[in-house]
Amino acid sequence: MSVRTIATALAILAASAGLASAQAPKATGPAKPQQAQAPAAAAGPTRIQQFKAWGAYSYKSGASNVCYVLSVPTTKEPASVDHGDIFFIVSQRPGQNISYEPQAMVGYVLQPNSKVTVTIDKKNFTMFTKDKAAWVENAAEEPALVAAMKTGQNMSVSAVSGRGTKTSYAYSLQGIAAALKQIETCK
């Protein structure tokens, strides 16, 4: 993974940190995410270790550490469009009491009020969207999504761009369990 790719992921992750707790109650629909706030004096990311398709990273945000695992898709559809930088991240922010928060990040603005679907071995998870990112719609399903990632073989992410283009991404789940284990003790 290139330095530019990692730096882009960090910038997006840092900018979206204020959205981390913007989870939607299932019965009432998605809540409006809070205004994103960039952390003060965030240091660049440090790669802890690479585990096949997934890297484990950390950076300092204020007085606390943020740890995350990150992967890029193995395929992007449709192949004829510029997708920009695409990532799937699972972050852990102990200073904010956030543990294993999955997030899809894309290089384009997603269609407003659209849903992103994550499919792992035929099990679907729904994410709500805001600008160039998506989070699990029902926070209570985050542990199930992470557990499915640890034991699954294949993961795909389907989205709709602001222009109405249907996009999909395939990810390898090789190394995700080891990468998550590596950030387990993030403090």
Say what each PLM segment does.
Residues 1-23:
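Sec-dependent N-terminal signal peptides
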Residues 2-4, 22-187:
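A generic "folded-domain core" signal
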